[in-house]
Amino acid sequence: MIPGEFKFGQGKILCNADKKAITIEVKNTGDRAVQVGSHYHFYEVNSALDFDRKLAWGKKLDIPSGAGVRFEPGDVKKVNLVDFTGERRIFGFHDEVNGYLD
């Protein structure tokens, strides 16, 4: 093995394979780009993003950890969201939850 080398198993790595995803349409109504990271509580994203926020309660983007989705002004995109798991406690972001989701 070479120092720093990674050896991966065979086949594809599936993210969130065991989680049910929903698809929503999101429009950036603002005049600036908005970037949303993989672990951000989607319900609390920038208010310039227009979508049915009730559907996003307790959910995050269905993308690999550390990735993000960028919405340019006027962009309309469909994104997949999955539930937060574990204790389902959310703190920070825009301070709209600060506790248990359920």
Curated annotation (Swiss-Prot):
Pathway: Nitrogen metabolism; urea degradation; CO(2) and NH(3) from urea (urease route): step 1/1. The keyword Cytoplasm applies. GO terms for cellular component: urease complex. Keywords: Cytoplasm, Hydrolase, Plasmid. Disulfide bonds: none annotated. One of its GO terms (molecular function) is urease activity. Its EC number is 3.5.1.5. It catalyses: urea + 2 H2O + H(+) = hydrogencarbonate + 2 NH4(+). GO terms for biological process: urea catabolic process. Its main location: cytoplasm. InterPro entries: Urease_beta-like (IPR002019), Urease_betasu_sf (IPR036461), Urease_subunit (IPR050069). It is found in: Cytoplasm. It comes from the Bacteria. It holds the Pfam family Urease_beta. Heterotrimer of UreA (gamma), UreB (beta) and UreC (alpha) subunits. Three heterotrimers associate to form the active enzyme. Belongs to the urease beta subunit family. This is Urease subunit beta. It comes from Clostridium perfringens. The lineage of its organism: Bacteria, Bacillati, Bacillota, Clostridia, Eubacteriales. The gene is ureB.
